[in-house]
C-alpha cells in the first residue's frame, strides 16, 4: 500500500530507522519536503528516492560524533525541487546522484579532511547552485561537475578560508537569467567563484554567456596557486566582470583569457601583480568606455585610452 505524506515530512532523529529507507512506494503531495536532521548515529544504510521530486534536506550540524564518511548512501532523487546537504564536517567525499533541480546547496562539509565533491550526473540547476565553506584549509580539495551545462540564476562557489586545487565544469555553457541575485550590489553576481587555489589553470572551457555579473575572486592570499584564469569561449557578460580583489594582492595569476569576449557591461581588474598583458580584451573594447574599464594595482595598469591606442601590454613581451 502507498503511504500518503503531508507536504512536509520531518525526522529530527534517525536511530529508529535502519537498513534501507525506500521512498519509491510512497505517495507524496506536490512540492513535498523531506527534512532529515541527524543528531545521533543512525543505522540507516541507504536512502532511495524513487520518483520523489520534492525537496530533500539533510542536516548533520548537530550530529555527534561526526562520521568520516556519509553514514548512508543516497540513490535516486534524479529530479528535485531543492537539494540541501549541510553539516557533515568530517567526511572526505560527497557524491550525489541528482540530474536536475531548482536549487542545490552544499555547505559546511568536509572541513576536517581533504574533501572531494562529485556531482557526476548533474546537468541543470534551474535556480541557484551554492557551495559554501567546504573543504579543509591547506588541503587538496576538489570539485567535479562533469555534465553540468546550465545554472539558471546563480552559481556561487564560495570556499571561504579553504581552497580547491581542482574545480571542473567542462560543459558549463550558461549562468544566470538576468534577474538580480542580491539587493546589495556588492553581492549581486550571477557567477561567483574563488578559484585562486586551483593548481595550474582555472578554466571554464565551454562557458559562453553570463546573464548577470561575474566575480573571479582572489580573496584568499594564503592559497594562491593558480597561474591563469581562462574563459576561452565566453562571448558575453550582461553585467560587470570583476577579477581579483580590492585589498588582497595575488602574485600567482599571470594570465587572463577572455579572448572570445565581445560584450560586457564593465570590466574591473585589481591586485593581480603578475598580470601585464590585457590584449585578451581587445575585442570587447568598443562596447566599453572610460567609465566601464578599470585596472588597478596590477603589473601593468592601462587606461581605457591606452588600450584603444594599442598599449595593451602585449607589446612589452
Placement of each model-derived feature along the sequence:
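Concave beta-strand-loop units of leucine-rich repeat
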Residues: 1-13, 18-43, 48-121, 126-144, ...
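Substrate-binding/specificity loop regions of serine endopeptidase catalytic domains
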Residues: 148
Amino acid at each position: 500500500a502507498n503511504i500518503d505524506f503531508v507536504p512536509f515530512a520531518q525526522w529530527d532523529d534517525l536511530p529508529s530507522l535502519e537498513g534501507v529507507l525506500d521512498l519509491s512506494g510512497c505517495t507524496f503531495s506536490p512540492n513535498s519536503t523531506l527534512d532529515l536532521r541527524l543528531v545521533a548515529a543512525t543505522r540507516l544504510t541507504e536512502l532511495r528516492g524513487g520518483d520523489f521530486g520534492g525537496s530533500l534536506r539533510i542536516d548533520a550540524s548537530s550530529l555527534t560524533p561526526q562520521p568520516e564518511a556519509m553514514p548512508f548512501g543516497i540513490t535516486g532523487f534524479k529530479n528535485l525541487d531543492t537539494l540541501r546537504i549541510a553539516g557533515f564536517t568530517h567526511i572526505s567525499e560527497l557524491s550525489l546522484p541528482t540530474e536536475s533541480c531548482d536549487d542545490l546547496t552544499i555547505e559546511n562539509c568536509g572541513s576536517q579532511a581533504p574533501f572531494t565533491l562529485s556531482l557526476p550526473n548533474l546537468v541543470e540547476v534551474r535556480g541557484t547552485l551554492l557551495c559554501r565553506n567546504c573543504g579543509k584549509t591547506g588541503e587538496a580539495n576538489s570539485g567535479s561537475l562533469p555534465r553540468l551545462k546550465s545554472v539558471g540564476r546563480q552559481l556561487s562557489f564560495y570556499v571561504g578560508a579553504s581552497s580547491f586545487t581542482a574545480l571542473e565544469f567542462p560543459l558549463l555553457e550558461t549562468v544566470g537569467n538576468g534577474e538580480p541575485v542580491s539587493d546589495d550590489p556588492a553581492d549581486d553576481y550571477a557567477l561567483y567563484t574563488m578559484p585562486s587555489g586551483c593548481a595550474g589553470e582555472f578554466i571554464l572551457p565551454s562557458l559562453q554567456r553570463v546573464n548577470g555579473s561575474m566575480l573571479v575572486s582572489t580573496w584568499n592570499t594564503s592559497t594562491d596557486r593558480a597561474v591563469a584564469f581562462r574563459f576561452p569561449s565566453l562571448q558575453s557578460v550582461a553585467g560587470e566582470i570583476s577579477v581579483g580583489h580590492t585589498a588582497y594582492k595575488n602574485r600567482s595569476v599571470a594570465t587572463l583569457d577572455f579572448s572570445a569576449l565581445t560584450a560586457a557591461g564593465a570590466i574591473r581588474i585589481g591586485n593581480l601583480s603578475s598580470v601585464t598583458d590585457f590584449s585578451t580584451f581587445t575585442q570587447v573594447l568598443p562596447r566599453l568606455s572610460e567609465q566601464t574599464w578599470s585596472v588597478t594595482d596590477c603589473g601593468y595598469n592601462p587606461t581605457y585610452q591606452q588600450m584603444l591606442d594599442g598599449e595593451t601590454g602585449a607589446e612589452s613581451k
